[in-house]
Amino acid sequence: MEGKVVVVTGASMGIGEAIAKLFADHGASVVLLSRDSSRAEAARHRVGHTDRTLALACDVRQREEIDRALGVTLHHFDRVDVWVNNAGVGMRDAAADMEMSVCRELFETNFFGTIACMQAVVPAMREEGDGTIINISSVAGHIPLAFGAPYSASKFAVNALGKAARMELKRDGIHVLTVCPGYVRTEFGANMLAARKGNIRPQSVRGITAERVARAVYKGYRKRRREVIVPWTMIPAVKLYQLFPGLVEWGMAKAMQKL
């Protein structure tokens, strides 16, 4: 990865920070983006390799901030080889009761922010004739979550975006990888937009680590995969839902009764 430049959004903690660290450990120059510049800088020092890392404030809901961060990156490193769309927020509420303003706020980050970042970085990658865009989605983008309809819908949309963009950008030498983690042990579950935080399943229960997700991201990138589902034990569940959705929904309803 020496000589490669990687940009990671939502990099101040959790999966984003773990991805930034792994790519930096493999020799890449890494730019950590976060809405909070102080948190991004703190993550940069935890990542290490400060001679070839950069921390910048960037709210993916604001195109001008994306363009500014990209401009600084190109000024410092001259290129972008990998752009990781990791910034995201959650929401737990019943579909019939959720506040539409909160739902729109979630989509602004999870979906429209991903599109905005892709549109910003693609011209630079086209100029190089090479590049990889990695979208961090979720297993919830394959199997919808009760009381998590907006989050699941945003991740279904990210999955579809990745598939379409992959076909469109192939002729430009740009690859699009979608990574779908299951439950991850991070602070993400505590950072919900909606007030009903008590409905969320604890992320510490049978979850995987952010570092494991980062390894899956790196391996998927190196092998030029189209999609990675992590942990692999979630793959049968995804396939089962595609074939027998009623059975999976029955099982999920039973599990919800125990929460």
Feature locations, PLM:
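Active-site helix of classical SDR
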Residues: M118, S154
